Amino acid sequence: MNQPILELKGIEKAFPGVKALDNACLNVYPGKVMALMGENGAGKSTLMKSLTGIYAMDAGEIRYQGKAVNFDGPRHSQEAGISIIHQELNLIPELTIAENIFLGREKTNAFGGIKWAEMFREADDLLKRLNVKHHSRQLLGELSLGEQQMVEIAKALSFKSQVIIMDEPTDALTDTETESLFKVINELRAEGCGIVYISHRLKEIFEICDDITVLRDGKFIGERAVADTDEDGLIEMMVGRRLDEQYPRIDVRHGETCLEVTNLTGAGVNNVSFKLDRGEILGVSGLMGAGRSELMKVIYGALKRESGDIKLNGKTINPVTPQDGLANGIAYISEDRKGDGLVLGLSVKENMSLCSLEQLSKGVQLKHYEEVTAVEDFIRLFNIKTPTRDQIIGNLSGGNQQKVAIAKGLMTRPKVLILDEPTRGVDVGAKKEIYQLINQFKAEGMSIILVSSEMPEVLGMSDRIIVMHEGRISGEFMAADANQEKLLACAVGKTTEQNNEVAA
């Protein structure tokens, strides 16, 4: 194997109450893609922040191109040739695509004027390389979340770096966008660029990566060639044990109908009808832009309903705000936990109890003991890894943030729990814990809607599945009768009847 272009040796970093990195190591080789794997909280993000100078490491050594380095911050590391694509977007919606790509390093002439034509041309070339069908003069805020992620990737490519770190780069991408990204990764690999690829999607790791480095509890566990390992072995390295079946669905006798939606039309939703029983998990599948999240938000009251009926336990409800949804007994866990679900500057306790303050109050007085007791109970139940309940939630790993978001909804004691992409950006160990919690709520008779872009997840955890296409339901299946081919056919517009004709 050739010499590493980047070496991190014995990196240590501690925060109050927790040792985030304990002798962590990473080697990045030119012309190769190194997967950096580990559960949420394993230290992956902390290691990358230590590399780029966001955090000052307590001990260890970083060598880049054979020389010891210690970067003062991301700008310093970028200038040296190391770029990082963060999982959270670092862009400004009110600026154009080109302005976002070249923000802080605009191309100027001898008089200090911005060379707009050159900047737009270079930005357009980057977008074309990533197969993004937008002009760089367009405002970033007009793009979908996945397209904005591609702009973030284009921004990193514009630095012409020797090392590129990609943190969950496909999290918000469609399959087509992911294919375009992989094409670019292969081009970068051929050009000799070293890439660090952080992802919880094991399929992607085995498709695009050459080698794998695993961290667990901040410690270096090992480095392996992808060709020399398999999914089970990788999972065991990550979690320290072998996991049983991936989707632990349980069978529960369903109760009476809890939620009934009839001819519902609203923002992005057209004439949708379905029922949901007590103790049932209803999976909602479909491609990006099919109207899945919009349907959930109309039911919850976050988007406007134009016509149709919503009944909860036989009574018609009319949610026009999220507060109405909560008051009616509907909890919605957003797909965008950082944008809609959590307040990153508040503590774990404050976030978890945010929607339950009325229930936890007597008059205008908050019952602090009851609040603390409830929060501590959920921290234990969900196995949330946090030094204290007063830890700022922005300092937690993605998986632990997601657990807090779900606990926040459950603290309202809902009749219907809507989970929109509940395991997005969550590692395999935390996924298993979330699935087990979902089963527990199901066994207690809660009605659950599971919206997911991962078809195996929908098939593995649901009792019944509806598929959406262009704001309508294009198919409905019992889980036992469904497979990925049927779901995908309905997702692109075929009806259940057409599916059955093809199967026959």
From Swiss-Prot:
Superkingdom to which the source organism belongs: Bacteria
ABC transporter domain boundaries: 6-242, 252-495
Main localization, broad class: membrane
Coiled-coil parts of chain: none
Binding annotation for ATP: G38, E39, N40, G41, A42, G43, K44, S45
Class of the enzyme per the UniProt entry, highest EC level: translocase
InterPro entries: AAA+_ATPase (IPR003593), ABC_carbohydrate_import_ATPase (IPR050107), ABC_transporter-like_ATP-bd (IPR003439), ABC_transporter-like_CS (IPR017871), P-loop_NTPase (IPR027417)
Example of a GO cellular component annotation carried by this entry: plasma membrane
Subcellular location(s) per record: Cell inner membrane
GO MF annotation terms: ABC-type D-ribose transporter activity; ATP binding; ATP hydrolysis activity
Reactions catalysed: D-ribose(out) + ATP + H2O = D-ribose(in) + ADP + phosphate + H(+)
Keyword vocabulary terms for this entry: ATP-binding, Cell inner membrane, Cell membrane, Membrane, Nucleotide-binding, Repeat, Sugar transport, Translocase, Transport
EC number(s) from the headed UniProt entry: 7.5.2.7
Membrane topology according to the record: Peripheral membrane protein
Family classification: Belongs to the ABC transporter superfamily. Ribose importer (TC 3.A.1.2.1) family.
Assembly information from the UniProt record: The complex is composed of an ATP-binding protein (RbsA), two transmembrane proteins (RbsC) and a solute-binding protein (RbsB).
Function: Part of the ABC transporter complex RbsABC involved in ribose import. Responsible for energy coupling to the transport system.
Name recorded for this polypeptide: Ribose import ATP-binding protein RbsA
Species annotation: Photobacterium profundum (strain SS9)
Gene designation: rbsA
